[in-house]
Amino acid sequence: MQINLKDVSYIYNEKTPYEKKVLTNINLTIEEGHYTVIVGKTGSGKSTLIEHFNGLLIPTSGEVNVDEMVIVAPKNKKERRELAKKLRELRKSVSVLFQFSEQQLFETTVLKDIIFAPLNYGISEEEAIERAKELISLVGLDESYLEKSPFELSGGEMRKVALCGILALEPKVLILDEPTVALDYRSREEIMDMVKTLQKEKKMTIVLVTHNMDYVLKYADIVHVINSGEIAFSGLPEELFSNKELLKDNSLELPKILKFYYQLKEQNIDIGLFPREYRELTDSLKNMIKRKKENE
């Protein structure tokens, strides 16, 4: 499932004294099966952008194409009704996990929370429960958690349950808006590794909004930088992090691993690759030291 934005602009509170243009002529493609990361400083328009991907927001001008479906601003009541029907089905395939997603939990048990959306889309209770059991295991929680109140869980556990509720619809595209914010290190890594597993095993398209440059380097197939509602860069992580001027202009920092990598290069120590993970860096250093010893 490919998402394509053509000349998309969005204005909050249009035709009021509080009118504010947030997106300007966005042209962007989310490729099927890719892990796409969107970055930019606070207030740049990232969250507004992703809410166009499944019609939570409708472009003021321009169009959003999701496979064969075209989303444009409706001109009358009839078009609004028709669009609302199409968007309901679209949101089954393109799902969003928002910041502080644990605030979306509301049922008395974890099970009821996870099966709420599938039941509302006409999936049988038996199948919904089977999905819940599979998903709770996928996120690393015991099946006994299904009978617990979600409000008895830790922050990381609640975030995992919220993710299960999204995944229960079996979306083709999963959009995550700062999914690890305010979590401890272990919970952050568990969630990010889990999302990568979903992409690989279920061939799911992932869109991640983050301020964490380490995640950009480690996970992104493609990265888009948004600044003041416009696309400032689209390309590979290596291209982004090799352009110091671009990073500075968009208030982005190098990932920690690349800071060390460039310090090595300044000392004429070339490890021979652009590391995306600490393991790659340490393995390359070990191999370099080994070769040096063998040549002595």
Positions of PLM-derived features:
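Helix-to-loop junction immediately C-terminal to a conserved catalytic motif
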Residues: 54
